[in-house]
């Protein structure tokens, strides 16, 4: 892969060459740019694209952190990118359509990790917008982590790519938040064409004003012009003239001298995968990516940078390649610095792939972990060293086997003394090479060995013989005293006497070793390792720092001196070959005499076979109504020679739960999905012999993941690493590896015995409810030498379980593996849901008829319902008949038919969909006689009188009951004008709030509201003395019904009555025309719940904001209480007070939100009780949960929960409890716990709001009065509490009202000292009256005083009326 560069050197090199050729090879309107363009850090680098028609290479646009207006940058000439397009972290770019309006083809000749289009972390990108992009000829797309990117679900990528299975589109803006609209759909004049994606038939477009281009079906795979005329077959993407290969926008195969051709003409060569060039052109291209200056080569009709694998240049003067003899040589070396010093793994990396080292090799590795395997990886291909080899002070080396291919040391340059192989002072070196498998020649020079205490002299002498240097060295060149003095160099051979194997254990014994002095033998060490091939040596993978590929076990000497030592090796893998050898541990030197050692030859032994592991990645797809295609991968551990697979399948019974539903109810039709084609059907079915027969015929289950999905999961972590390494100008902190999804759970028993079922009686009856409990038999087949099969003769649209077992050569004795299984459903059969027989009818009394029909004999799964379409000549009516009703009556009755001629047709609906309509049946309903009408009148008149009298009695009873309830003190139910409670018959009438549509401008989306999208915009003249005002604009979804539009406007009408600083204001309404708009005060910081969560310290983007202090919490509480006090004063019960329904302004003021806006966004905060609407149970008071009573007292309870949300930064109340548990917990008197670090003052206020008796809770005015001293000074200027509207009545008036309405508990102040039936005025706290404000009740009762209304506390033990806390400075 080519690496990008921020500079211009490679681009300039290409540019010099291409500039002269561009005019002759492409239309004169532009030029060919290459070899790839990298634009980063500075948006002005985009000017490099100004004249580009084709980018021959890649295009990177990345790491531009400064947001700019890109509208001034437009590159209409660019039509083709030959490799890939990559965009990453470009701030401010909202669409690619303006940048590249005519980009038509991305060829994908070279890919960015399998992708031709990558859009990654583009934070401001709103749409892709490449409306002229017609083809991505190779590779997939990856669009990931673009938080604001929409219009992804409206693009049909299958029209652009040949295959979409490898596309990766994850982490972008959720489609339901996008509101994607294709051109014309809002005006109900759609301009775009429709296609089907994931079973959704919808319009396809790039943006709100650009459709996705589709060619007529007559063109097939050919491109087309803008006028939908078919292009020449050699054109790709588009063309200017039909059937003309000289006017193509891009070529399907190759471009040569203005013409698109299927192959390059003789004398020309393919270049960069898309055009033809001659030999002179290829010879003059500088190789910008090669370390030498040999230029490009010609091979197999293509002009390329380097010879392909297995080929080498014929000579340095030739442009042609010839096959290598063996591995292709790679010469390394520096003419100036002839000695290559290897002192670390890093320096060894420079020799990776080298086969010939021109110069000398000096190895000086003093330390390092796992050094041997690393050196072998980087130096293992070296065959020839032209100079000398010197190994000194390399204490980390045990062996030189890492130079596994070294065969020749030329010695053209030698050390002083004519040494060409020099080994000095290597304290742990024990082996040079395995001379049984090594041929090494030292052509010139001598060898020198000194101070290698563990290297036996015999090893050095053996090298003399193999390398042909014997006789060259003098006596002092190989020092026998300081080489091998610490090693057991003269070894006896230990011989194994017995071996016994199991599947995971080996027992070995060997002859007893007897040194001259038994005391010199200390113990034995057994070495063993996995050895797939019989080519291991004792020193493989060893270094002096402890790395060793061998496992070691110490064996003590047997107590009996005559006994044979042995060892049990356990924890081994089944059916695995192991290499084992034994070494005696002896004293190496006693009084300067060498002690003979002992070790065995390497023994190769294989463990026994065992049951295989389960097959992997079982997938199934259906290609017809009677077949399932099954594919899997071999087991990870065959534990033997894998011989065959057992495939077993079982039809699953229908889900009885489905049968209990009445599918005539709305939204009851289940998801219909069969096992769609997730694997290559042609590949599986190419051999009909793999089919197996026999079988039988259940509800949809989750489909198994496709191969593409699994591959995408595997590649994700690796892709991220490659991608982040590529962006070398940025610093990344890699995320922890994502865990792979667990494999399917399988049975924990092996299949040691099997019964083969070949036939089964078909007793299935769709009308029999017992079939829901049926246990169907398994069928079985053996599959040899393949990991796929086709199961035939299955029932249509039926669920099957398919088990796959692995079996190896020992299956007859050990059994097969446990199963891996998959569930799959066959496709529906055409016509299976049609009603087979004629529809008959019988007349019934009272203008009714009874229709009868037979059920489908073998439907697609379960019959859910029948639909009857009947009518006279005027209009058809429809009647739904549930399956249960049909089974009960054998048909359906049509009632209250008017006299006349009728036709009726019937259609069955199964799990897979609808059947065909039956042929019409004709019937006649006669008119009633006069006598019948008279009798009906006689019967109906008394019934009507009884119904009227009964209705009056019920009304009187309800009125009396309601009046008595109001006297019991259980709360007053105010008539609420909440927008959920209004008559749908109300019709909105424009008034002075109407705003002209042209005064409104929408800018950006804010979020989804109850009725539709909410936008930020600008309104002109809606606020006095402000020419323009930033506003929030609420809209209605285009699919909304008339009722919903009326609800939307009437909700706005409620807001017209409110004029309070702490309630979000309505600014205007646009009701004329479509869409309907409601203009609200803009609350830039969103809802209080989101705002509080953004203050959490762990939030990623919270770099400035800090959690609120106590004074800020009290300020929020006071502002919310002031807004609620205003609503209470206007006889409005909110019913849904919560942090999500409060809004935060630019100056951090908290206001009561416009009602209903957040109900969709926080849908999980609501709970549907029984068949009722959604209820916010976690914020509701006990009386509201029990009786559905909503009063200002219940709003106070909710206010206490809001205080708890403020203190916890918007945690969910009653965390850990389900909605049903919360409902019971609150009704039984449970309360929220005190939040961590919550000030006592705030928690006491919460507890006061959560008094079980509604009358014991303070009013909102009392709450404000208790904390008014803590509020900011501006609160007095803007609040309802201090306004003239809240001026309290005179004491005489209040006392008179109390005497006149003693049962009105709403007006009774909560005075703890009240103990008599008379209700005198409470005293003002400290005898003072608030300035510019009402008198305030401050509840400071002593707990020793008698508590009021103690009998009304719901029977809760030790319940006390908590006083409102005294405010204090934070």
Swiss-Prot record:
Species name: Rattus norvegicus
Record-level Gene Ontology MF annotations: ATP binding; G-protein alpha-subunit binding; identical protein binding; insulin binding; insulin receptor activity; insulin receptor binding; insulin receptor substrate binding; insulin-like growth factor binding
Biased segments, Basic and acidic residues type: 1322-1331
Principal location class: membrane
Protein name per the record: Insulin-like growth factor 1 receptor
Domain Fibronectin type-III, residue spans: 490-610, 611-709, 835-928
Glycosylation sites recorded in the entry for this protein: 51, 102, 135, 245, 314, 418, 439, 535, 608, 623, 641, 748, 757, 765, 901, 914
Gene Ontology CC terms: alphav-beta3 integrin-IGF-1-IGF1R complex; axon; caveola; glutamatergic synapse; insulin receptor complex; intracellular membrane-bounded organelle; membrane; neuronal cell body
Modification Phosphoserine occurs at: 1279, 1283
Disulfide bonds: 33-52, 150-178, 182-205, 192-211, 215-224, 219-230, 231-239, 235-248, 251-260, 264-276, 282-303, 307-321, 324-328, 332-354, 456-489
Keyword flag ATP-binding: yes
Binding site for ATP: 1006-1014, 1034
Record field: transmembrane: 937-960
Modified sites of kind Phosphotyrosine: 981, 1162, 1166-1167
Domain of life from the UniProt record: Eukaryota
Enzyme class: transferase
Residues annotated as domain Protein kinase: 1000-1275
Post-translational modification note: Autophosphorylated on tyrosine residues in response to ligand binding. Autophosphorylation occurs in trans, i.e. one subunit of the dimeric receptor phosphorylates tyrosine residues on the other subunit. Autophosphorylation occurs in a sequential manner; Tyr-1166 is predominantly phosphorylated first, followed by phosphorylation of Tyr-1162 and Tyr-1167. While every single phosphorylation increases kinase activity, all three tyrosine residues in the kinase activation loop (Tyr-1162, Tyr-1166 and Tyr-1167) have to be phosphorylated for optimal activity.
Gene3D superfamilies: Hormone Receptor, Insulin-like Growth Factor Receptor 1, Chain A, domain 2 (2.10.220.10), Immunoglobulins (2.60.40.10), Phosphorylase Kinase, domain 1 (3.30.200.20), Receptor L-domain (3.80.20.20), Transferase(Phosphotransferase) domain 1 (1.10.510.10)
Catalytic activity: L-tyrosyl-[protein] + ATP = O-phospho-L-tyrosyl-[protein] + ADP + H(+)
Region (Disordered), start-end ranges: 1304-1370
């Amino acid at each position: 892969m080519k690496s990008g560069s921020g500079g211009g050197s490679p681009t300039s090199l290409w540019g010099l060459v291409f500039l002269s050729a561009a005019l002759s090879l492409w239309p004169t309107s532009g030029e060919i740019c290459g070899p790839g363009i990298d634009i980063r850090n500075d948006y002005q680098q985009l000017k490099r694209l100004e004249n580009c028609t084709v980018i021959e290479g890649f295009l990177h646009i990345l790491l531009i952190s400064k947001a700019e207006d890109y509208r001034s940058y437009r590159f209409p000439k660019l039509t083709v990118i030959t490799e890939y397009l990559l965009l990453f972290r470009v701030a401010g770019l909202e669409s690619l359509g303006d940048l590249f309006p005519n980009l038509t083809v991305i060829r994908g000749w070279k890919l960015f990790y399998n992708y031709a289009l990558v859009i990654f972390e583009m934070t401001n990108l709103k749409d892709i917008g490449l409306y002229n992009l017609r083809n991505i000829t190779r590779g997939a797309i990856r669009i990931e982590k673009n938080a604001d990117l929409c219009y992804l679900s409206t693009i049909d990528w299958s029209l652009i790519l040949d295959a979409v299975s490898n596309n990766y589109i994850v982490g972008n803006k959720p489609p339901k938040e996008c509101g994607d609209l294709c051109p014309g759909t809002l005006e109900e004049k759609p301009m775009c064409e429709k296609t089907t994606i994931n079973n959704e038939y919808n319009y396809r477009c790039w943006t709100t004003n650009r459709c996705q281009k589709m060619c007529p079906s007559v063109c097939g795979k050919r491109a087309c012009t803008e006028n939908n005329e078919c292009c020449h077959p050699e054109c790709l993407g588009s063309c200017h003239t039909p059937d003309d290969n000289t006017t193509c926008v891009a070529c399907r195969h190759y471009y040569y001298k203005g013409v698109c051709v299927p192959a390059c003409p003789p004398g020309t060569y393919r270049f960069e995968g898309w055009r033809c060039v001659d030999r002179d052109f290829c010879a003059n291209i500088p190789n910008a990516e090669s370390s030498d200056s040999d230029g490009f080569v010609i091979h197999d009709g293509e002009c390329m940078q380097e010879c392909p694998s297995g080929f080498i240049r014929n000579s340095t003067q030739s442009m042609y390649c010839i096959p290598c003899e063996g591995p292709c040589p790679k010469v390394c070396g520096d003419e100036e610095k002839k000695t290559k010093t290897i002192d670390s793994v890093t320096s060894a990396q420079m020799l990776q792939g080298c086969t010939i080292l021109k110069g000398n090799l000096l190895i000086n590795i003093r330390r390092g972990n796992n050094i041997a395997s690393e050196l072998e990886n980087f130096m293992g291909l070296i065959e020839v060293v032209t100079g000398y080899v010197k190994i000194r002070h390399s204490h980390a080396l045990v062996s030189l086997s890492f130079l596994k291919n070294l065969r020749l040391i030329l010695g053209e340059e030698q050390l002083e003394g004519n040494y060409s192989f020099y080994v000095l002072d290597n304290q742990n070196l024990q082996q040079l090479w395995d001379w049984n498998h090594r041929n090494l020649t030292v052509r010139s020079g001598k060898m020198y060995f000194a101070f290698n205490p563990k290297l036996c002299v015999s090893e050095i002498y053996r090298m003399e013989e193999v390398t042909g240097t014997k006789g060259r060295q003098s006596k002092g060149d190989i020092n026998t005293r300081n080489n091998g003095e610490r090693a057991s160099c003269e070894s006896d051979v230990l011989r194994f006497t017995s071996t016994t194997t199991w599947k995971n254990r080996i027992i070995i014994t060997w002859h007893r070793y007897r040194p001259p002095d038994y005391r010199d033998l200390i113990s034995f060490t057994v070495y063993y390792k996995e050895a797939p091939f019989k080519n291991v040596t004792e020193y493989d993978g060893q270094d002096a720092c402890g790395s060793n590929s061998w496992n070691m076990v110490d064996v003590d000497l047997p107590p009996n001196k005559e006994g044979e030592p042995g060892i049990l090796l356990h924890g081994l893998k089944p059916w695995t070959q192991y290499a084992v050898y034994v070494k005696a541990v002896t004293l190496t030197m006693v009084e300067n005499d060498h002690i003979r050692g002992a070790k065995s030859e390497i023994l190769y032994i294989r463990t026994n076979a065992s049951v295989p592991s389960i097959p992997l990645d079982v997938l199934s797809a259906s290609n017809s109504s009677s077949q399932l295609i099954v594919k899997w991968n071999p087991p990870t551990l065959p534990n033997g020679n894998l011989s065959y697979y057992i495939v077993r399948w079982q039809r699953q019974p229908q889900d009885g739960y489905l049968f209990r539903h009445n599918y005539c109810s709305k939204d009851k039709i289940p998801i219909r999905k069969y096992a769609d084609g997730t694997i290559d059907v042609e590949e599986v079915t190419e051999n009909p012999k793999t089919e197996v027969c026999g079988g039988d015929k259940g509800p949809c289950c989750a489909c198994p993941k496709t191969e593409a999905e699994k591959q995408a999961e595997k590649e994700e972590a690796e892709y991220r690493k490659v991608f982040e390494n590529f962006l070398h100008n940025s610093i990344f902190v890699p995320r922890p590896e994502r865990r792979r999804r667990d494999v399917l759970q399988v049975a924990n028993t092996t299949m040691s015995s099997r019964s083969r079922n070949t036939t089964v009686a078909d007793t299935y009856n769709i009308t029999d409810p017992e079939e829901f409990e049926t246990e169907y038999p398994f069928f079985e087949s053996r599959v040899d030498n393949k990991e796929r099969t086709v199961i035939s003769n299955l029932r249509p649209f039926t669920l099957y379980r398919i088990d796959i077992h692995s079996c190896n050569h020992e299956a007859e004795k050990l059994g097969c593996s446990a199963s891996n299984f998959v569930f799959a459903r066959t496709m529906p059969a055409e016509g299976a849901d049609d009603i087979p027989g004629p529809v008959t009818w019988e007349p019934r009394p009272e203008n009714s008829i009874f229709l009868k029909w037979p059920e489908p004999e073998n439907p697609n799964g379960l019959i859910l319902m029948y639909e009857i379409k009947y009518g006279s000549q005027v209009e058809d009516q429809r009647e739904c008949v549930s399956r249960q009703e049909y089974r009960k009556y054998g048909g359906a009755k049509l009632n209250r038919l008017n006299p006349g001629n009728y036709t009726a047709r019937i259609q069955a609906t199964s799990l897979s969909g609808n059947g065909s309509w039956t042929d019409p049946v004709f019937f006649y309903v006669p008119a009633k006689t006069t006598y019948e009408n008279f009798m009906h009148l006689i019967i109906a008149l008394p019934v009507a009188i009884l119904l009227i009298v009964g209705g009056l009695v019920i009304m009187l009873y309800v009125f009396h009951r309601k009046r008595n309830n109001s006297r019991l003190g259980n709360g007053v139910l105010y008539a609420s004008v909440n927008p959920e409670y209004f008559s749908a018959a109300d019709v909105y009438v424009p008034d002075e709030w109407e705003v002209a549509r042209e005064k409104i401008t929408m800018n950006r989306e804010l979020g989804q509201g109850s009725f539709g999208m909410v936008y930020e915009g600008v309104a002109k003249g809606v606020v006095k003395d402000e020419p323009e005002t930033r506003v929030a604009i609420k809209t209605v979804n285009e699919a909304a019904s008339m009722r919903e539009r009326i609800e939307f406007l009437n909700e706005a009408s409620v807001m017209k009555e409110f004029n309070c600083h702490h309630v979000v204001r309505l600014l205007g309404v646009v009701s004329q025309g479509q869409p309907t708009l409601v203009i609200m005060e803009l609350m830039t910081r969103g809802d209080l719940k989101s705002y509080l969560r953004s203050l959490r310290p762990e939030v990623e983007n919270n770099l400035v904001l800090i959690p609120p202090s106590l004074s800020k919490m009290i300020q929020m509480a006071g502002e919310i209480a002031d807004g609620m006090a205003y609503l209470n004063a206007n006889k409005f019960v909110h019913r849904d007070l919560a942090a999500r329904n409060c809004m935060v302004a630019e100056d951090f003021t908290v206001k009561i939100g416009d009602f209903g806006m957040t109900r969709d966004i926080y849908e999980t905060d609501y709970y549907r009780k029984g068949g009722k609407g959604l209820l916010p149970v976690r914020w509701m008071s006990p009386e509201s949960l029990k009786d559905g009573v909503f009063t200002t007292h219940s709003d106070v309870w909710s206010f206490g929960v809001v205080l708890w949300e403020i203190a916890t930064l918007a945690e969910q109340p009653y965390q850990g409890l389900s909605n049903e548990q919360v409902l019971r917990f609150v009704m039984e008197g449970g309360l929220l716990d005190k939040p961590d670090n919550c000030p006592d003052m705030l928690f006491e206020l919460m507890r006061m709001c959560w008094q079980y008796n509604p009358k014991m809770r303070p009013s909102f005015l009392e709450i404000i009065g208790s904390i008014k001293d803590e509020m900011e000074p501006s609160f007095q200027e803007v609040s309802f509490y201090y306004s003239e509207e809240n001026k309290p009545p005179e004491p005489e008036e209040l006392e008179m009202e109390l005497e006149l309405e003693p049962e009105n508990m709403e007006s009774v102040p909560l005075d703890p000292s009240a103990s008599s039936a008379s209700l005198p005025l409470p005293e003002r706290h400290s005898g003072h009256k608030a300035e510019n404000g009402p008198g305030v009740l401050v509840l400071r009762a002593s707990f020793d005083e008698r508590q009021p209304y103690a009998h009304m506390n719901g029977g809760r033990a030790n319940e006390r009326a908590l006083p409102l806390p005294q405010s204090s400075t934070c």
